[in-house]
């Protein structure tokens, strides 16, 4: 549940990287870093203890995003977890939902791998033979790899497959969003 790091890469309209955001977060609920998380990410307990709390980092992140943005994620859970944490800290009003986003994992599965099963980010990086210059499982590194994969996917086709995160459900019938894709409707 508890987010301990936010990392993102900002792309311009030509998909050129123009900025990065990377911050660790001092945990409030699970104050002791689990050894598996430590081993997977390389984040240390000392680093987390010296970090700002979620509310500070989130406000900085949303300011960094600006007004005109769309999230690109690897999978469909990043926005759910972000909003769960925002709700816990009373900050959900900073992100109006339902949220439109690009699920790059879905794009890769449908447009490149032609497979219905989930695929790891590292597998997609390998598929495109991208250089592995940084470790996986750090937020900003994974964001950079996701952006690299996104750049190599047919943008016109991908943008037809955008996703809507429904963590925040429409409040009335007029706010409902209905999507029709080539192979399904929601």
Whereabouts are the PLM-identified features?
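A short, structured active-site edge motif that brings together acidic residues
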Residues: 24, 96-111
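Alpha-helical transmembrane segments that form the membrane-embedded catalytic/substrate-binding core
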Residues: 139-149
